[in-house]
C-alpha cells in the first residue's frame, strides 16, 4: 500500500466516521444509508444489532429519531489500524448531547465506537460499528435550547 493510498483511504474513512454522526444528527437518510455495506452490522449496546443500509434506517427512523427531539454528536480520538490494504479497524470516542422526547429531558451520552471498514471495488464503507455507551446521563433541570431562545422569552 503506497503512502498516497494510505492517506486517501484515511481521509475517506474519516469522512465515513463523520457521515454516520452527521446523518443521525441532521436526519439525512441518504447520507446515513450510503455509508454501509449491504452485509454491515450496526450494534448499539442495550438497543440491538441492525444490518445493512436498511437496518441503519430502521434504527434511525424507529428508535433514535423518535427518542430524541434533536441530537448533536462530537466524534473525537479516531484511531485507525490498517489490517490490510482493504480493511481497517477503527476506534473513536463519541459525545452526544440531545433532548429526549420523553420528559423533554436533556441527556449526555459518552460512548466508544469500534468500527471495521472495508474497501470493495475501490470504495470504502462501514462493515461493522459497535457503539458501547460509557455514560447515559440525564441532565436534571437542563433543556438544551437554540441560541436566542432565552432572549425570545424575555
Swiss-Prot record:
Pfam families: SnoaL_4. Keywords: Detoxification, Lyase, Periplasm, Plasmid. Pathway: Xenobiotic degradation; hexachlorocyclohexane degradation. One of its GO terms (cellular component) is periplasmic space. The active site is at 25, 73 (proton acceptor). It catalyses: gamma-hexachlorocyclohexane = (3R,4S,5S,6R)-pentachlorocyclohexene + chloride + H(+); (3R,4S,5S,6R)-pentachlorocyclohexene = (3R,6R)-1,3,4,6-tetrachlorocyclohexa-1,4-diene + chloride + H(+). It is found in: Periplasm. Gene3D superfamilies: 3.10.450.50. GO terms for molecular function: lyase activity. The keyword Lyase applies. InterPro entries: NTF2-like_dom_sf, SnoaL-like. Homotrimer. Belongs to the HCH dehydrochlorinase family. This is Hexachlorocyclohexane dehydrochlorinase 1. The gene is linA1.
